[in-house]
Amino acid sequence: GILDIAKKLVGGIRNVLGI
């Protein structure tokens, strides 16, 4: 769902930022 996609995007951004 959209929420799952949003969570994946946020997770990816966090991964890149190292947060």
From Swiss-Prot:
What is the annotated localization of this protein?
Secreted
This entry carries the following GO cellular component terms, namely:
extracellular region
What keywords is this UniProt entry annotated with?
A: Amphibian defense peptide, Secreted
Q: Nucleus among the record's keywords?
A: no
The principal localisation class reads secreted
Has the keyword GTP-binding been applied to this entry? no
Taken from the UniProt record, the cysteine pairs bridged by disulfide bonds within this chain are none
Instruction: Name the tissues where it is expressed.
Output: Expressed by the skin dorsal glands.
Its BP terms in the Gene Ontology are: defense response
Q: Name one Pfam family in it.
A: Antimicrobial20
In Swiss-Prot or TrEMBL terms, this protein is called: Uperin-2.6
